[in-house]
Amino acid sequence: MLPIPEELTTLISDLELYLADGLKGENLSKKAKEKREAFIKRIKEVKLSFPQDFKDKYAEDSEEEEDWDSNEGGSLQSERTDKDEEACEGAQQAPAVAAQDLTSVFKAGYLEKRRKDHSFFGTEWQKRWCALSGQTFYYYGSEKDKQQKGEFNIEGYRVKMNSSLRKDSKKDFCFEISATDKRSYMFCASSVKEAEEWVKQIDFVLKDMTGIIPEEEEEGQELYDDVGQMDEIYEVLPEEDMPSPPPKVEPVSKHPPPTPAVDKSTDYANYYQGLWDCMGDLPDELSFKRGDAIYILSREYQTFGWWVGEKNGQIGIVPKDYLMELYAL
């Protein structure tokens, strides 16, 4: 007997996957459910009739069938797909870490991740909870997962917006993390602004790794150049037109009036709480844990992403992106 073409066995397996997995969460009528079960049963009978052609695929489907009986939407199957993709790329698997245990998180939230390979009936984009922790990009099924579905180190990568990844209304929400001779990762955010924030944070970490001067210092350099231009203007002016310097005023030897005290018990707008654990690297940085209440004393370093906060009598600078408002006003 001639073997069944591989294209046909793949199509039958994909059809079974769609009937058993893709339609599992749909609100089907009683008649449609009966038809669905009948088709699944018939496909299994066909596979049993040609064991030499469906040997490997049938073994995989048997394992997946057990997962479908106890999981919604075949989440274990998608997790296996993610791990298989990582293994195929030769990526080094990091130890399992729960989403809530990540530290030094620069950016986190839900994204749609594009699968490297997907079947005819499979989903090309999968919803994932993603987090940039230090130099590692993690992705989970949800923010409550105890183990990541995959991760990769962003060293050597570059990030950019890419509207060619999709053809629908979300095409402008997409960005790509790629590198030469490495696997590319494609994601879709909920909006253009959210995608741009992801690109900005990832690019910031990449620049920090390569020692490129941050934007704030570049702006300072531009300000220095402006001062040089002002000097040139003053040199052109005639000397007689130069205004005379103001008379020197001797400082008054008395203390300035005290700043009115703020009642912290009612100053709810300046109370924040930690989103994640944060351990200070320097003596002037304030350490805190997720859920700790922090009172903000000053926002004068906001341009650099830092505030001055107080916790249990200790004062130090805190990263503002690690905080959220404690009270809803």
Curated annotation (Swiss-Prot):
PTM entry text: Phosphorylated on tyrosines.
Primary localization: cytoplasm
This protein's UniProt keywords: B-cell activation, Cytoplasm, Phosphoprotein, SH3 domain
Subcellular location: Cytoplasm
A Pfam family of this chain: SH3_1
Keyword Phosphoprotein (UniProt): yes
Acidic residues compositional bias, start-end: 61-70
Biased composition regions of type Pro residues, renumbered to the chain: 243-260
Reported function: May be involved in B-cell and macrophage adhesion processes. May play a role in src signaling pathway.
Family to which this protein belongs: Belongs to the SKAP family.
Protein name, as recorded: Src kinase-associated phosphoprotein 2
Species annotation: Takifugu rubripes (Japanese pufferfish)
Record lineage: Eukaryota, Metazoa, Chordata, Craniata, Vertebrata
Chain's gene name: skap2
